[in-house]
Amino acid sequence: MAAATATAGTAACSSSSSSRGGSTDAAATSGVQPPPPPPATAPPEPLRKPRMDPRRRQAALSFLTNISLDGRPPLQDHEWGGGEEGGGTKPGARARLSLLAAGCNAFSAPGTAAAPWTAGSGSSPCPLPPSLVPRVLGEPSQPPRSAPAVTGAQLQLPDGPGGAGQEELEEDDAFTNVQVPSASFLGSGTPGSTSGSRGRLNSFTQGILPIAFSRQNSQNYCALEQSGQGGSTSALEQLQRSRRRLISQRSSLETLEDIEENAPLRRCRTLSGSPRPKNFKKIHFIKNMRQHDTKNGRDLKLDGGRQSAGAMSLKEIIGLEGVELGADGKTVSYTQFLLPTNAFGNRRNTIDSTASFSQFRSLSHRSLSMGRAGSTQGSLDAGSDLGDFMDYDPNLLDDPQWPCGKHKRVLTFPSYMTTVIDYVKPSDLKKDMNETFKEKFPHIKLTLSKIRSLKREMRKLAQEDCGFEEPTVAMAFVYFEKLALRGKLNKQNRKLCAGACVLLAAKVGSDLRKHEVKHLIDKLEEKFRLNRRELIAFEFPVLVALEFALHLPEHEVMPHYRRLIQSS
């Protein structure tokens, strides 16, 4: 009994964990409780770091594998030589596996703790299957077989026609089923953890290299596997140098490629896990900057199937003659419509300030028009026609002498002169008035009777339907008559111009709210039988044709305002 007790005490001193069961059995057999081992001699148990959830680790590895460091999408199997069959090797997977072997060799360097790697099995650190070496070196590989466990995960290299589905999954991402120990991710200060993270970054960089670089890099890393068993520091330095050299070569080749192809940008989705588009092509970013206004301020995709009024194409209706909008990628400058800032600061605050400013504006516009007429753009195509040189007269189109024509009889008396018109059929009088107007203004494409009829419709819509005041209607008349006298109106766009003038006058002359603007657009669409999109798109061409002069002087608005007050 004493011998058994002495034997149990000796076993407790020699081993703290493995022989404890034997001493307990001996003590139980003898019936004597052995003394507890001294706490000073027992070695402390190694601290267990919190184990990462395998699902979170798998998700993190999958995310890090699918992203790329230079913005390119992850490469698929068919782009890395998908035509090879059977024992053919994939350069992308081959390079990734060689990098995995290099990272594992760095972990197995002398002086590093290999206990976390060999805890689950008695194999060497980071074991690789025998089929890895022939696959890396480009030799025919053998049928798939399972490899020793790496912390509970298996690295399988399926090859051949038998494992088609698994081969597609494995070769698409060589790191999907490889789980690195949690010590390398949770901040262990050993050199093995640093080398493992660096090897993983090298694998990500290698995965996006061209095919030629992948083959060359795999050979270099295989040579490092054979010669890097002595020390991990030299192997890591060589890995870093090789990676920097390959990145610089890749960037230089991409620069040359971009120069040769007029610097196109690769526009594709870079979402994590999203497949690369099959019809992948390079699109220049300037060609992709066309927004909605593609053809003369309109979107033909939205309105291509709709037939417009007057059996005219949409391209002919939208846009005013002589108005450049910068369609089809052209750049148009409107700086000639601007006035100098000091024109507003040098005016005196007197009663005739409005008249002096209006005279200055008319003189500036006259000199501007004459300057444009003397330039190389003084042609009808550029908009410098007869109407651009005329000063606007608010009484011109409302002159009561227009309907007289050849049917009038002038009576001269000593103190006054009067005109008498005999009875004439209204149709003949209208025809005579339009002919006289056409002779005097040949550049205006609409007749005088049609212009006056449109003005009556504008007034009825603005005052009766929308409740606008007379100054707003007078401003709309000025805008519309300026377009008519400059020859911008025709039979196809006359209602669009009238609606755009009413809309601009309502925005400038009235404080409209959102629902009021919507109500006005609805009324214009109903009364003038217009399309809402065409009306809104026509607003900017009218603004350009008016030379952005929406704030009108008093002498242009007051005559129309007086006539509206008298007739109401």
From Swiss-Prot:
Residues recorded with modification Phosphoserine: S248, S274
Gene Ontology annotations of biological process type: cell division; G1/S transition of mitotic cell cycle; nervous system development; regulation of cell cycle
Cellular component GO terms, alphabetical: cytosol; growth cone; nucleoplasm
UniProt entry tagged with the keyword Cytoplasm: yes
Region (Interaction with TDRD7): 1-98
SUPFAM superfamilies: Cyclin-like
Subunit and interaction comment: Found in a complex with p53/TP53. Found in a number of complexes with CDK2, CDK3, CDK5, ABL1, TDRD7, CDK17, CCNA1, CCNE1 and TP73. Interacts with CDK2, CDK3, CDK5, ABL1 and TDRD7.
Role noted for this protein: Cyclin-dependent kinase binding protein. Enhances cyclin-dependent kinase tyrosine phosphorylation by nonreceptor tyrosine kinases, such as that of CDK5 by activated ABL1, which leads to increased CDK5 activity and is critical for neuronal development, and that of CDK2 by WEE1, which leads to decreased CDK2 activity and growth inhibition. Positively affects neuronal outgrowth. Plays a role as a regulator for p53/p73-induced cell death.
Protein name, per record: CDK5 and ABL1 enzyme substrate 1
Protein species of origin: Mus musculus
Gene coding for it: Cables1
